[in-house]
Curated annotation (Swiss-Prot):
CDD domains: bS6_chloro_cyano (cd15487). It comes from Synechococcus sp. (strain WH7803). It holds the Pfam family Ribosomal_S6. One of its GO terms (molecular function) is small ribosomal subunit rRNA binding. This is Small ribosomal subunit protein bS6. The gene is rpsF. Residues 99-123 are annotated as: Disordered.
Amino acid sequence: MTQQPYYETMYILRPDIPEEEVESHLTKYRDILVEAGADVLDNQMRGKRRLAYPIAKHKEGIYVQLSHNGDGQQVAVLEKVMRLSEDVIRYLTVKQEGPLPAPRVVPGSEPAAPQPETAETSA
């Protein structure tokens, strides 16, 4: 039995975009994939980082990672929209084989597991 591959799309937004607009971009691209028939597994904003080299006269960019399932048709739809957007300065989609990534745990969202008590010996 073969596992269905999943895809990871990393895209970089212009650094001068307001925070509200960044959130709308995250929602926009996730919704495009869902409408095209993909299952979105994870949508992570990696934050503003310095670029290795200038892209379109920008030295920084806002990195976003999007993991999704699908038959591959959705990738073309997503990349077409990103190509036409002035806010996306670079994007890359990679097909991943193998098991799906473990769900990410956001720090502070779950209480810490209790630590097992160790017996202290006194001599």
